[in-house]
Amino acid sequence: MTMLIREGTLEEALQVVTRVKEFANGETLDSMSQRLGDKNSLILVAEKNGAIVGFKIGYELDEDTFYSWFGGVAPQARNEGVAQMLLEAQEEWVAEQGYKTLKVKSRNQFPAMLRLLLRNGYLI
């Protein structure tokens, strides 16, 4: 039951998007591609036993700011620390790239995400 966090593709992220009911009527491969455009971006995936169970996507807003845009964890992999591992991997990559700020938005309808952000010292 080893969890592997690695750079992935939008197609891999979409495997999780389609399994998360909170994202119903949400993003498609085309909409995600358009959002990223030619911006400097990072697509992380969490892989467990060969299956993609989580993702985190972000992109550059400006030379100092990276925006953590979209992420999720498949229902069967929740409460296993997947979101925390993805967040830590993204933070490490953002720091290595020299960004000064990591910006994120969330909504009250995603209380688990709000708790994760608060636990990690984010201002919301």
Residue ranges of model-derived segments:
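Conserved active-site alpha-helix within GNAT-family acetyltransferase domains
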Residues: 84, 108-124
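Short acidic/polar active-site loop segments enriched in Thr and Asp
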Residues: 64, 100, 123
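Active-site rim helix/loop that mediates acceptor-substrate recognition in acyltransferases
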Residues: 22-48, 57
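Short strand-connecting beta-turns/loops that link adjacent beta-strands
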Residues: 38, 49-51, 61-64, 109
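Conserved acetyl-CoA-binding loop-helix of GNAT-fold acetyltransferases
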Residues: 73, 79-92, 119
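Conserved GNAT acetyl-CoA-binding A-motif
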Residues: 94-106
